[in-house]
Amino acid sequence: MWAQVDNNTVTKVFPRPQAFSIGDNNYPANTMSVWSEANLNAIDIWEVVEDNTNFKDSEFYINTNVIYTYNSGTGKVDATYGTATAKEMDDVTVDGILTEGLKTIHKRRIDNQCNGLLAPSDWRVTKQEETGSAMDSGWKTWRASVRTKCNSMQAQIDGAADVDALAALYEYTGDPRTRPLGEFPVKE
């Protein structure tokens, strides 16, 4: 990535090589790939160095736009993020418009996963109800364990004190890899 700098101010960013003009001079797209760094710097085209230190997981945070600043000390353009803002944990209504918070969104995902696991065996429940034939106890036990795990996961989500605590529920660690939220049971 490169940037055009004029009087120590970034005037244009090139995410990939592309044709450009400076004054009356036109340059083909391959200029950025073929020319040396010194030759590019001579026409005020500088390498961009990305710093993602402040960038946070966009699932849980609202990141700022990238800020491009010419750094005369390094002779590069720094691409940095401002301080990320945590998304709302709880639902918020402003002027009659509801915006779902992270807890609602994540609990719905868990509900959808639970539904996806149970749906293929729903016919067994229907058959039992319609015909009176008993469902295999292994299926009953597994279905109950899926619902129990769903409720447990949602309780953990509700119990998360802040965005970082919620994000931590999904982080896999250790060997074997596990996460605090856990996993749904598998039908054997």
Predicted segments — roles?
Residues 1-188:
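A preference for well-ordered globular domain cores
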